[in-house]
Structure formats: structure tokens, C-alpha cells
Amino acid sequence: MKMRAVAVFTGMLTGVLSVTGLLSAGAYAAGGEGNMSASATETNARVFSLHLGATRVVYNPASSGETLTVINDQDYPMLVQSEVLSEDQKSPAPFWWTPPLFRRDGQQSSRRRSVSTGGEFPSDRESRQWICVKGIPPKEDDRWAEGKDGEKKADKVSLNVQLSVSSCIKLFVRPPAVKGRPDDVAGKVEWQRAGNRLKGVNPTPFYINLSTLTVGGKEVKEREYIAPFSSREYPLPAGHRVRFSGR
């Protein structure tokens, strides 16, 4: 018996954020650690984050690489640190992001390329990796923070609290044998009840992402992707009677 569920599919992922606070020496300018000056406490924190020009990148192993636009929306320069990680978001993936470290001026953008350095991926389905970029704030003595006129831009952005933000998007390795798009086959996912959980079976070679999933008008939370040729279980809404429709 198969379950009637309503699912809205999307191939996009919002950025995964990791925030780290960096306390500058300016916060302790007057009176030491326990006696911060009024001017120091009035300084606002700034976030060093970057805007990516896409929510995902599809990589064809037969291509020469894929590009992604990196945008600095801030009014000050920052270093951009980039890397490609495996599905666990911990170990390095066999990709080279060129260049892995570069400066981006305020209100400026540039296109960067990811290139495969080898590795073995299945030929009959998508594989998922992660592209991560991190904005690094300048310090007062960083020469790269100088403007074109030689002015120290770092002095203007030296804050008592600086937030360095890392944003990650999906990199799908899609082999030539996998034709079509995920949107074209998303309706093929089969939904079943497994105890007090909802089971989605993905018979396609694509990663299927769910933006919304409802059962009987109630939203199913903790939505996650369903990997190719696999299944995933989701908690059913509490107190809801599940009705089946057989096919």
C-alpha cells in the first residue's frame, strides 16, 4: 500500500552558515579586559560574508570545469577562502577551486572555477559535494587591506567584534549517462508509511530535495534530501491519522 502525500520539490539549497566571532584588540583599548571604554562598546559588529551567484552547481565530469560568481556585498575588502568538501562536509573533495584564496574589494564580484582533480564517482547517478566560501576580515596590519590610494581600509573596518561567515552550496557531479533534470522525475518518488514515520523512496538517479512536505494538510518537519536509488524516513505529524490509497 502506498501513501498519499503532497511534496513540493526543489533543487536549491540555502547557504549553510557557520559563524565564528573574532574579538579585536580595539575592544580592550581603555582600562583592560574588564573595563571597556564607551567608544569601544558603541562600535557595531560587522559580518564578513559573501553572496554566491547560485544556490547549487551541476558539474559535468566531461567538461573543463564549472564557474560560480562570488560577490562581496560589503563596503570593505575581505579575503575569500574557498574549498570543495566531500558529502560529509569535512574531508576534502577531489576538486580544485581557483584560486583557493583571493582578495575581493567591497561591492565587487568575480567568477571562479572549480576543476576536478580526479576521484571516482558513480557513472549511473549523481554524487554530492559541497562548495564552501568564507569571508576573512582584515587586521590592522594587513597590507592586502590597503585601498588603491594606499589608504588603510582595515582601520575603517577594525571592529570590536568581527563575524567571519562560511557559506556552502551543493556541488552535484552529474555523469553524462544521467539525462534530464530532477524536476522532471520528482513525481516518481513513492511514499509509504513505516510505523510512525513517512518513508520516501527515490527510484531516480537524481538527488531529490523537498522544500515542503505535507500529509493531510499538516507539514512534515525535518525535511532532508533523498539520495539517488535510496530512501529516507521523516517523522509524521503528531496526532494525525494516516490514510492510505492503494495502487
From Swiss-Prot:
It holds the Pfam family PapD_C. Residues 1-29 form the signal peptide. InterPro entries: Ig-like_fold, PapD-like_sf, Periplasmic_pilus_chap, Pili_assmbl_chap_C_dom_sf, Pili_assmbl_chaperone_bac, Pili_assmbl_chaperone_C, Pili_assmbl_chaperone_CS, Pili_assmbl_chaperone_N. GO terms for cellular component: outer membrane-bounded periplasmic space. Belongs to the periplasmic pilus chaperone family. It comes from Escherichia coli. Keywords: Chaperone, Immunoglobulin domain, Periplasm, Signal. This is Chaperone protein NfaE. SUPFAM superfamilies: PapD-like, Periplasmic chaperone C-domain.
